[in-house]
């Protein structure tokens, strides 16, 4: 019996009572507020993420030529963004055959677009772990600690215009993503949500995105490779909303 993949509803997530308590109910207004606060001097960890971001994107920009040792170092580099220690490939040596397959897959996903993604998925919008695409991505998950979060970050740094990062903060808004199939469903829903935002007011969205990108470049030394993609901007807002939800719950438990 074929399992139906999970469906993620971003709009419903933003309408949850715990979200509405901390937002204005208008995504573009919330976007301007949350992105504006990220460069606050008190947000040291957040600022550290923003500072290091373009360097990691640049590291993976020529992934088709990445060597075995640089792939391993790159995955450890990404885990510098995470609270958990990395157990690379379950502590087992990565075979040359698996490395070649991984490099080929990473080189391929660097070119993915929404059109390619839709063609790759089945009619139900799911990936199949038994197919060629699924096997390669399950191997990718394996080398990133068996973690969907780690895998999503690697995919994002490979192709920041298409793959959104997923973590526990975003889960607080849209729900949990536990499998490769569910991550694919999350990506598909993310792009549907993005279209709705842009259809609502693409000019205002672009103004806010560009203002934040320019502010980051000014703050961190006018880095020419400091690009905040549409995907990255929306993901950052969801991250900040989710983080605020988690922080408010902690405060409620320990007033």
Each predicted region: which residue ranges?
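An N-terminal alpha-helical hairpin/helix-loop-helix interaction module that forms a charged
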Residues: 1-142, 160-255
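Short hydrophobic alpha-helical segments that form membrane-spanning helices or hydrophobic packing faces
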Residues: 150-157
């Amino acid at each position: 019996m074929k399992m139906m993949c999970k469906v993620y509803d971003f709009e419903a997530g933003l309408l949850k009572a715990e979200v509405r308590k901390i937002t204005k109910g208008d995504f573009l207004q919330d976007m301007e507020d949350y992105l504006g606060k990220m460069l606050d001097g008190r947000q040291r960890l957040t600022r550290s993420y923003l500072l290091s971001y373009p360097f990691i994107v640049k590291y993976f920009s020529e992934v088709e030529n990445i060597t075995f040792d640089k792939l391993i170092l790159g995955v450890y580099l990404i885990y510098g963004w995470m609270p958990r220690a990395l157990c690379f490939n379950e502590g087992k040596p990565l075979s040359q055959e698996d490395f070649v397959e991984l490099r080929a897959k990473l080189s391929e996903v660097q070119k993915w677009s929404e059109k390619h993604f839709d063609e790759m998925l089945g009619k139900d919008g799911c990936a199949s772990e038994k197919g060629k695409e699924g096997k390669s991505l399950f191997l990718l998950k394996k080398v990133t600690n068996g973690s969907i979060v780690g895998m999503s970050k690697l995919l994002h740094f490979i192709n920041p215009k298409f793959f959104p990062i997923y973590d526990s903060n975003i889960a607080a808004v849209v729900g949990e993503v536990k499998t490769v199939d569910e991550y694919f469903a999350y990506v598909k829903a993310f792009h549907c949500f993005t279209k709705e935002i842009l259809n609502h007011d693409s000019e205002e969205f672009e103004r806010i995105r560009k203002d934040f990108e320019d502010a980051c470049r000014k703050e961190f030394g006018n880095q020419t490779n400091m690009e905040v993609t549409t995907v990255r901007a929306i993901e950052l807002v969801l991250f900040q909303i989710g983080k605020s939800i988690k922080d408010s719950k902690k405060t409620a438990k320990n007033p």
